Amino acid sequence: ASLFEVAARLTHAVEEAQTLRDDLLPRMETAVKATEYAWQRGRYGYIELTEAQREQLALRLALITAATNAHLYRIEIERLTGDSP
């Protein structure tokens, strides 16, 4: 891949990680807490609670994947430019 392509992938991975960390995960944490609260009061079933928790874990995994990819793309840029610490 060219330096330009890797830089574009890095930008995308960083933006994805930031969106997940700053926007989607906080909203999902709020939703899980609300679902847990409703479940404790009998308004939601266990299936709804576990589904909310599963979705939260999926977002956490997506964040880890995006952050990992960002690091890998940074390493690739360093390799392509010969600029490593």
Predicted segment positions?
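Amphipathic alpha-helical coiled-coil segments
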Residues: 1-62, 69-80
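Small/polar (Gly/Ser/Thr/Ala-rich) solvent-exposed segments
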Residues: 83
